[in-house]
Design a protein with these regions (language model features):
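Gly/Ser/Thr-rich active-site loops/lids in small-molecule metabolic enzymes
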Residues: 251-279
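Short Gly/Thr/Asp-enriched flexible loops that form oxyanion-binding sites at enzyme active sites
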Residues: 152-163, 249-257
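ATP/nucleoside-binding phosphotransfer catalytic cores, i.e., glycine-rich phosphate-binding loops
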Residues: 10-16, 76-80, 98, 285-342
Length: 342
């Protein structure tokens, strides 16, 4: 397929560009429906005139419906999106990026979606859809799924769909987190995933971070200890990777600690651990939930993070972080590979 695509790019460059644009529009309608032309144009950074012309063509082909509430994808349109996905990835060179990323970061599998989630919200949803698709095809009955907080995990929850085997699956927060925005808390995300997947959930009502005294007190609470054992024994772990200073400020970390993170060159954060460029742990937040060593016991660990700005943080984390699947976007993948080649 790669040779054919390269030939098409030489002979019909405009055709491939048009195909990619129409696929992107159709896929965006599928994600954001019902959506108006103006909203779609803003999402894709296209002019309304271009969107109107393409929408008219897609409507004539029976791929979308135009209603007073906005545009909706038809069943035929969904089939086209599904059938075109693999071809579009190959055409855009994403399959090559996936293989390079897999080798560079030493992960079992890498999935790269188009775009840059730093400035395109729909890209985060695409990463979320990729994560849900993988989960749907691999999850088994009676498995426990632990999920961290954050905007990327919230996008995964937004994309969640019913699972065939999920009626007996349990979703739990990977750690405490009361104090953050409610929509980005692990508790909220775990509950939403369970609701959409027809699964069950348990919540963990503890702040993050904790003082040493509070930590020991909470561990002695039977109810908290029970949920903690469930969390640390999770079969599947879904987590994001954050920029160290961004995460520290979001959690209202004391200025003294932030200065220490700067002095120690902290660049990434996951599960309350802060890592430098070499992947060494330079600071750890006292938190109730999954610890790094627990990842080696999980059957499947899925990391989801994207955006060109996160490339350094991602590279840092994967110096020692365990992951069976890494889902990212095109901008982050390219920046990671560029950084490794310097």
């Amino acid at each position: 397929m790669r040779a054919l695509i390269d030939l098409q790019k030489k002979l019909y460059p405009d055709l491939l560009h048009t195909m990619q644009q129409r696929y992107t529009i159709l896929n965006s309608v599928n994600m954001f429906q019902p959506i108006g032309r103006r909203g779609l144009a803003e999402h894709l950074s296209l002019t309304e005139r271009v969107v109107r012309a393409e929408v008219d063509l897609l409507h004539d082909q029976g791929l979308i419906d135009v209603t007073t509430k906005g545009m909706l994808i038809t069943e035929e349109g969904k089939v086209v999106v599904e059938q075109m996905a693999a071809f579009m990835k190959e055409m855009m060179g994403l399959t090559v990026l996936e293989e390079q990323l897999k080798d560079t970061l030493h992960v079992g599998k890498a999935i790269v979606v188009p775009g840059n989630s730093d400035n395109e919200n729909w890209v985060k949803l695409e990463m979320g859809k990729a994560c849900v698709s993988f989960l749907k095809s691999t999850i088994m009955k009676n498995q426990t799924v632990a999920v961290t907080g954050g905007t990327t995990m919230a996008a995964v929850a937004h994309a969640m769909v019913p699972f065939t085997a999920s009626n007996q699956c349990l979703f739990v927060p990977a750690r405490g987190g009361i104090g953050e925005k409610v929509e980005n808390q692990a508790n909220t995300i775990a509950a939403e995933m369970a609701r959409k997947a027809n699964g069950d959930y348990r919540l963990l009502y503890v702040p993050d971070p904790l003082s040493e005294t509070s930590y020991q007190t909470m561990l002695n609470e039977p109810a908290i200890n029970e949920i903690l054992q469930l969390i640390r024994g999770s079969d599947v772990v879904l987590h994001g990777i954050g920029d160290a200073l961004t995460m520290a400020k979001r959690r209202k970390t004391a200025n003294e600690i932030i200065q220490q993170l700067v002095a120690k060159d902290a660049v990434s954060e996951a599960f309350g651990y802060y890592f430098n460029k070499a992947g060494d742990v330079v600071h750890k937040v006292r938190t109730i939930g999954i610890q790094l060593e627990d990842l080696h016991e999980a059957k499947s660990v899925i990391a989801v993070a994207g955006g060109r700005s996160k490339a350094l943080a991602i590279t840092s984390y994967f110096q020692q972080g365990k992951s069976d699947l890494f889902i990212t976007d095109e901008a982050a993948a390219e920046q990671i590979l560029r950084g490794r080649s310097l």
